[in-house]
Amino acid sequence: MAGIESVLQETRVFEPPASFVKQANIAGMDAYRTLCAEAERDYEGFWARLAHEHLLWHKPFSKVLDESRAPFYTWFEDGELNASYNCLERNLENGNADKVAVIFEADDGSVARITYRELHARVCRFANGLKALGIRKGDRVVIYMPMSIEGVVAMQACARIGATHSVVFGGFSAKSLQERIVDVGAVAVITADEQMRGGKALPLKAIADEALAMEGSEAVRHVIVYRRTGAGVNWVEGRDRAMDEVEAGQPDTCEVTPVGAEHPLFILYTSGSTGKPKGVQHSTGGYLLWALLTMQWTFDLKPDDVFWCTADIGWVTGHTYIAYGPLAAGATQVVFEGVPTYPNAGRFWDMIQKHRVNTFYTAPTAIRSLIKAAEADETSHPKRYDLSSLRLLGTVGEPINPEAWMWYHTNIGGGRCPIVDTFWQTETGGHMISPLPGATPLVPGSCTLPLPGIMAAIVDETGQDLPDGQGGILVVKRPWPAMIRTIWGDPERFRKSYFPAELGGKLYLAGDGSVRDKETGYFTIMGRIDDVLNVSGHRMGTMEIESALVANPLVAEAAVVGRPDDMTGEAICAFVVLKRTRPNGDEARQIATDLRNWVGKEIGPIAKPKDIRFGDNLPKTRSGKIMRRLLRSIAKGEDITQDTSTLENPAILEQLKEAR
């Protein structure tokens, strides 16, 4: 995997605005370097200081890092704390009790607000209700819920009593839900009658019932149902209870259960290359520390900020930057039930205007789809909305193409808002490589520099460091507090997946190709290692070819995959969404030729796609991620055998198959 060629040349640089630097939590590159130097000089002391300063401990820790069972590292192991206490009591005690914790906007546009005092009372009532059902410390609880205040309450209540939650995204099928229920050994499932998305109801309770009827789910004793819409649902006497009834009559206070710092706060499933999902296990102490620190560092959180992360609580972004980080930091945050295109593609901009959002954090794929919508319909263009409240933008989930970055910076940020392009993963717990908005000069398409304490490097397939300018494998050389602890029930898979022997067994394998700039030291993510293309012996990252395509004024979105080719070994296949209607026939052939030539000029002839297909959209999960595995199957002409239960737009698959 060494020797990936970096073909994307980006020379635009944006310095942090002086007014932003003046008030930043980390102001200027000298402040960043000072923190990095502290971590280099005394790694354990650096993390110990931060953990003592930022977390509330029931029992202070005496040991910082234990590496004796590497790669099964532990942090602050003899300390005890509670995540819910750090998110709720902290705010009751420091003057935030009557501050709005969550502004919830439902799919239909209705709004509810809840203060920290009210949220604390709700969490306590529900936690007491869970205890009354016999749910205890160490039990696993599956949460299969819509985006809602109740979803956050369920997660916080589990943390409060020491139960380990496993949130399953509301778009997953009954089979996918059942696999997770069985693998984690859940004793309870918390769900809703329905969830609303884009004006449509999805029957969560019916899906949960189907999952629980499958073999292996017998350990589930309780199903708790949040009545979101009031729709009639099947009811199993003795097993099923309404959420409000579980809370009814319970006290507004609930003593927290202190847990060890290494106690599993949650298990979150992520896709595995072999098909079986991986249960990523996260700790309480180290994870919560990083969730809080990155809120303060990357998002430069201020006391009066309104923060909005558009992710779902079913994904890690919704755990760290909705359920835990903002609450631990005492933020006011927006939680949104719906989708960015309902009732129209101006929904995000309308909500920023309505709630006076200061920090907006979303996915590049959402940005690209909204660029297309704005080009097609002036009424949904962001220029029609007052976005002056924004002071910081962020992106998450995949690399952002430079041209999408520029549109975001200009049209949403008004040219004044720094953009934090954050690289991280389910397994890392929080941001790993990201600009600090008051310190780092920004380069479109680059996630810039590792955060203080994160020892990122680029190596070859034997684990040897590569020189700057040469693409290779992204790794992390030292353990960090928020890292994955194991794969639930499968420690050997954990070791092989993340600390492979061929890299020496002690380097964390991120699974992404990356290159570090010779001049700045900035990291650019080139795509997943398994997305690297090898065309006539030239190794190229898909992200760079996609960026070249999206830089064309006709193109809204593009995804690039490889397929076998007798002549070149691998051929580049591009799936393209234009800013206008999908072309056909001679017109499609002409635009494809023009785009090939465009890529040839932007990168070089070697990067020209052999096959370009046009679609109305790309296959995406409900969280907005492009499902590249499906595109690889289409490019190869194979039948699609992968799980498509999270696919937002199944009809697009047939369209792309036929678009030859």
UniProtKB/Swiss-Prot annotation:
Gene coding for it: acsA
Gene Ontology MF: a single term: metal ion binding
GO biological process, one term: acetyl-CoA biosynthetic process from acetate
Name of the protein this chain belongs to: Acetyl-coenzyme A synthetase
The species this protein was found in: Ralstonia nicotianae (strain ATCC BAA-1114 / GMI1000) (Ralstonia solanacearum)
Entry-annotated residues carrying N6-acetyllysine: 625
Pfam family, one: ACAS_N
Function description: Catalyzes the conversion of acetate into acetyl-CoA (AcCoA), an essential intermediate at the junction of anabolic and catabolic pathways. AcsA undergoes a two-step reaction. In the first half reaction, AcsA combines acetate with ATP to form acetyl-adenylate (AcAMP) intermediate. In the second half reaction, it can then transfer the acetyl group from AcAMP to the sulfhydryl group of CoA, forming the product AcCoA.
Catalyzed reaction equations: acetate + ATP + CoA = acetyl-CoA + AMP + diphosphate
Family to which this protein belongs: Belongs to the ATP-dependent AMP-binding enzyme family.
Annotated Mg(2+) binding sites: 550, 555
UniProt binding sites for ATP: 397-399, 421-426, 512, 528, 539
The protein's Enzyme Commission number: 6.2.1.1
Needed co-factor(s): Mg(2+)
Keywords noted in UniProt: Acetylation, ATP-binding, Ligase, Magnesium, Metal-binding, Nucleotide-binding
Gene Ontology terms: cellular component: cytosol
InterPro entries assigned to the protein according to its UniProt record, in alphabetical order: Ac_CoA_lig (IPR011904), ACAS_N (IPR032387), AMP-bd_C (IPR025110), AMP-bd_C_sf (IPR045851), AMP-binding_CS (IPR020845), AMP-dep_synth/lig_dom (IPR000873), ANL_N_sf (IPR042099)
Cited SUPFAM superfamilies: Acetyl-CoA synthetase-like (SSF56801)
Entry PTM: Acetylated. Deacetylation by the SIR2-homolog deacetylase activates the enzyme.
Binding of CoA, residues: 197-200, 317, 536
Keyword Secreted part of the UniProt annotation: no
